């Protein structure tokens, strides 16, 4: 699976959490209703204006690799102060918007609200400050909630340094055609969506 790391020439992908809103229309009355689901989804955006030759080569290489790898890739994030360690999440929590974790250094600040972590290639945002207790355990509130709950007796490794999320490009074939036809000076916006 291809791993998107900090690019050499291209701007980095902007990640944001979007509410999962679906609009339904009644076939009987014609009225519409919007439903917001409890779990938001990650969306990434890569915007390149007035593309240079170096950026174009890097973009073509990226799109070709994602296309070849079945349109699933990982995005690595940076710049967070989460304590380096190899903690694990214990299951089940009974509620998938927090993690019971062990393996931290005791009595340490672990993360701030807004830091990112990943659990089994699911990218999460820490929603409240986290501090470990005297035995190195901590409860981490996260968003979005876990897509795949932790089963009883199972554990999941938590990645705190350069966490990753699993994404795909909608309509990769059309994006690949567009990128292949691009020339120096062109503009493009590519959207990526969480894959789960």
Where in the sequence are the language-model features?
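Extracellular/virion structural assembly segments
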Residues: 1-196
């Amino acid at each position: 699976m291809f791993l998107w790391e900090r690019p050499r020439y291209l701007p980095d992908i902007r990640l944001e959490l979007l509410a999962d809103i679906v609009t339904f229309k009644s076939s009987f009355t014609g009225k519409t209703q919007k439903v917001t689901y409890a779990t938001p989804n990650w969306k990434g955006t890569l915007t390149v204006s007035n593309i240079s030759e170096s950026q174009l080569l890097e973009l073509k290489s990226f799109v070709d690799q994602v296309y070849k790898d079945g349109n699933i890739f990982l995005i690595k994030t940076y710049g967070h102060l989460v304590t380096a360690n190899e903690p694990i999440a214990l299951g089940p929590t009974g509620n998938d918007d927090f993690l019971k974790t062990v393996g931290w250094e005791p009595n340490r600040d672990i993360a701030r609200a807004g830091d990112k972590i990943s659990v089994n290639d699911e990218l999460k945002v820490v929603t409240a400050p986290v501090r470990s207790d005297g035995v190195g355990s901590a409860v981490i509130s996260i968003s979005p909630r876990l897509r795949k709950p932790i089963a009883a007796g199972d554990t999941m490794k938590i990645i705190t340094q350069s966490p990753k999320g699993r994404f795909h490009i909608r309509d990769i074939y059309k994006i690949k055609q567009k990128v292949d036809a691009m020339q120096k000076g062109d503009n493009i916006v590519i959207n990526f969506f969480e894959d789960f």
